[in-house]
From Swiss-Prot:
It is found in: Cytoplasm. It catalyses: O-phospho-L-tyrosyl-[protein] + H2O = L-tyrosyl-[protein] + phosphate. Its EC number is 3.1.3.48. Pfam families: Rhodanese, Y_phosphatase. This is Tyrosine-protein phosphatase 2. Belongs to the protein-tyrosine phosphatase family. Non-receptor class subfamily. GO terms for biological process: cell division; negative regulation of p38MAPK cascade; signal transduction.
Amino acid sequence: MLHLLSKDEFNSTLKSFEEQTESVSWIIDLRLHSKYAVSHIKNAINVSLPTALLRRPSFDIGKVFACIKCNVKVSLDEINAIFLYDSSMAGMNRIYDLVQKFRRGGYSKKIYLLSNGFEAFASSHPDAIVSTEMVKESVPYKIDINENCKLDILHLSDPSAVSTPISPDYSFPLRVPINIPPPLCTPSVVSDTFSEFASHAEYPGFSGLTPFSIHSPTASSVRSCQSIYGSPLSPPNSAFQAEMPYFPISPAISCASSCPSTPDEQKNFFIVGNAPQQTPARPSLRSVPSYPSSNNQRRPSASRVRSFSNYVKSSNVVNPSLSQASLEIIPRKSMKRDSNAQNDGTSTMTSKLKPSVGLSNTRDAPKPGGLRRANKPCFNKETKGSIFSKENKGPFTCNPWGAKKVSPPPCEVLADLNTASIFYKFKRLEEMEMTRSLAFNDSKSDWCCLASSRSTSISRKNRYTDIVPYDKTRVRLAVPKGCSDYINASHIDVGNKKYIACQAPKPGTLLDFWEMVWHNSGTNGVIVMLTNLYEAGSEKCSQYWPDNKDHALCLEGGLRISVQKYETFEDLKVNTHLFRLDKPNGPPKYIHHFWVHTWFDKTHPDIESITGIIRCIDKVPNDGPMFVHCSAGVGRTGTFIAVDQILQVPKNILPKTTNLEDSKDFIFNCVNSLRSQRMKMVQNFEQFKFLYDVVDYLNSGVNQASKPLMT
């Protein structure tokens, strides 16, 4: 069961589980490790997975568990409760993806979500927070290694985190080239830990190597290690034997000599550089290149390391005290090929050490394999067909309603204050929709959607798998006991009118559609169809009425549909039908059918045309709810119902400006009410802004004379 708790409820629930000594509960922190290291809730586990992995179905909960650094291994059945939190409500989409992995993995116990985010929780409950001191970037690191381990040392600088178009939130590419020899230890996708240690069986040459950790060195320890190893290493520290934190290494890594001469060159950390070429215990998304240094082993050819050939070179001597070869890694920007270089697969490169400069990945420079597609030229409608590079789209801006990074909205959206206000109102509606989606699988929630997927036969009735009705508002068919009463349709009660919003009928749901119309309408009814039968070469709706007056559509159960009248109105661009429904032992029913065939998917219609059509439809006799459908039953359907509501209310209720509070904005409240009864109503920003255009049209005083479509 999923529970969305406030900060006070979250704290009290945490304390209640802490008092239960026999219960096992996990507190999972989904923030970046840089924030987790500053402060976090007591006993919280940091799971800083890339968003791409969280959204990947193949990356199941078992792989998530493999990435969690925890000394105690437990199964899902042993965990009594799970507590999840992120920085703020903006991280709810990441929490939702992780919750889905727990549910698909068979975890059915309670999951508690912090709705206010960590910042609000930390300010109100500081006693439940653990704070640590961040390690500054300017402080060098050292690694504790067993004194008996006589190994060559790679001198690597600690670069500042850089962003790549593939992974904008992390300092490493999501894809690394293949055929790279594995590192000493298999790094996890968690940004702060190695999830596995190197075993003696896998790495027999490292029997004397002990786990190591990073901490700030002292001058005395550096001098003592220089006398032993010829490099600033410290003796082993037993206090950190059980820890193995991971320090992110981006492609922009610089070389360092053993005798640094500048302050920048003194920012060095060290890692063992001669791990044997054996398969690690588990493949990882990022690896530190590490090659064997013994003379009897063949060095990898240039083709095998071509993805790193731009910033990795082989050098005979890096440290004068080392007799074997090591690797020297330099940034790409500062590479210069020597004119006397020999054609032996490697080249001598000269550069100035710049450890704080990140990799720019310009289009004219060669790219490593994992980043080659990132700057691929593409087309965008904003540029009217011109080619542009993704890196030149401008700076990233914070996205308060979804992913952590997002491109800024189009310039035309923020061209004026009114449009910008409408844009951010729509994004707030999207955030509320995301919050409701967290309770889709909660049977006690108003947003539960379990009835739409109880069996395969029921799932086939949905035209789109991601658009289903809420169980609370769905239409239930009047069927015999033991038969499914499901249809993808929802009762909509807004204002003083009632509607039934549904998807377009499929070939297998024609009987369900007409049974719904028969049982929910009186002597007279109205159906509004807002889609064509085919759009862009794909079927959007099955024809559910006879072709002409001479033929009737007979369905199971004795239901008979015949066409009594047909008209076309070119000025309003609408076709009208009058259907007669007959059933044994029942009076006939007359259904007025309005087919608007010029309103295409994810667009908006002409204002004068749609307002004239709605005024005419409202004059047609109707004894029940109005049936409205497009293809999915959410975008055009929700926009039509919202426009109908705008025409029903007095003009003094309509907003005169867009810069109103959400609670005082009629359109915002109307769309939010529609979405609380059927998901994704008024599907995109273009349709949402169209509602404000309708209000401006009505406030301008323009009135279209309407005539009845049917008499």
